[in-house]
Amino acid sequence: LNCHNQMSAQPPTTTRCSRWETNCYKKRWRDHRGYKTERGCGCPTVKKGIQLHCCTSDNCNN
């Protein structure tokens, strides 16, 4: 599985996930500087107020 792993508005980059990871994720939250986005492999647990999107196909988290 290949997932995007760039932060916020950085140019797109991807990473090859380990074979036991079956999801890509995109987390989005707001801080004092504006909205932040984090992407990567897996499907993490998030705190209240953080938007999370998990998906299972290559590069589905952009």
From Swiss-Prot:
Protein's name in the database: Short neurotoxin 3
Gene Ontology CC entries for this record: extracellular region
Source lineage: Eukaryota, Metazoa, Chordata, Craniata, Vertebrata
Source organism, top-level taxon: Eukaryota
Keywords of this entry: Acetylcholine receptor inhibiting toxin, Disulfide bond, Ion channel impairing toxin, Neurotoxin, Postsynaptic neurotoxin, Secreted, Toxin
Primary localization: secreted
Tissue expression pattern: Expressed by the venom gland.
Cystine crosslinks: C3-C24, C17-C41, C43-C54, C55-C60
Originating species: Naja mossambica (Mozambique spitting cobra)
Family in the record: Belongs to the three-finger toxin family. Short-chain subfamily. Type I alpha-neurotoxin sub-subfamily.
Cell compartment(s), UniProt: Secreted
Pfam families: Toxin_cobra-type
Known role: Binds to muscle nicotinic acetylcholine receptor (nAChR) and inhibit acetylcholine from binding to the receptor, thereby impairing neuromuscular transmission.
Bilayer-spanning residue ranges: none
One Gene Ontology term of the molecular function aspect: toxin activity
